Amino acid sequence: IQLVGKLNPLGTVSGTNYSALWGYSANGRDYAVLGGNQSIYFIDVTDSTNIRVCGSFTTHSSNWHEMKTYSHYAYLVSEADNSGVQIFDLANLPVSVSYVGQYNPPGHSRTHSIQQSGPYLYLNGGTFNGIKVLDLTVNPAAPVPRGLWNNFYVHDCSVVNDTIWAANIDDGKMSVINAQNKDNMTTI
């Protein structure tokens, strides 16, 4: 492995103020989506000799942020109270990024981790403890709440087709969940 370039937007030593990283590609360009404890950065990494921040936004203060992308949108969650799901429009990269807004599912305040599979987001842990599904089919900028599975606390999950593999760390187990019906997920 060879380091071909680096950028540290905060100028800190050892990256102590960063919490997660995700990738996004569009129009032949590659981007890093970097979460900081009070910020999110959209970084063009296409040319390792010219790595640059295309956009950054202040976010809810938390040591933990996680993000995923779908279509030309990025979705950011955190464990900060009342952080919901922050939505960013990436359509104008590399020129700019737009903040769409914050979506708060009914009764939802915070999320530990997020997964994406097809036009669905899976919110783990946090307010609901289990998994809350958001549907992006109609309008990715305006998620629609679907089902909730909360038999056990879910720290993180992996979604393969319509099957969820959920880490139930507080219970020392893993759950396998049928998510074919997003409104009524069932344990297999």
Protein language model features and the residues they cover:
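Feature marking well-ordered beta-strand scaffolds used for ligand recognition
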Residues: 1-188
